[in-house]
């Protein structure tokens, strides 16, 4: 896996992330930190050599996303979790503006940078907000109903169940408008809405998003998953 290693725009070094035990059939996968190493594309042989390049603890490693959109509609890339949902929200805002559509209630769009570390939705929520819908990737995998072409409606995650009325209305709208959807439970999942509730906000909450396969790796989704998420978001806030 290729990546640039950087502190700022003026100091970028390239390299690869590679398995120490490259023959997967011959070794137990083990822990990530025990089986992976970062190789710089520079003639370095010691920690001192690396330090002379200006690289130090705390620098970022950003993988080459290798984005591909296939003719059949599949979207393959790193960071679909959660840039794909960000695109959906920006498309929703663009739709409201260009089509001069008035939502049935006041709507705020909050895009955070800290969802993955647990506190993205913990602040900056206006006082008059009564309900919050997190638009985040839906999981695709064994035992789940969602695939890449669907919008996932999450009934429960690691923090517990989402609001029953919100989820029920989402399902009702999806059925009425023939939106491809699945209702799933994600026991290891957390969202910005979870962070808001932990911060003390007394609000109704829901979670929807396009199906994404192989999250936190080289991920795959589909145009239909994004479209179905957009359609459900519009139906819920505008119709």
Where is each model-derived feature located?
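N-terminal hydrophobic/helix-forming segments and targeting peptides
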Residues: 1-239
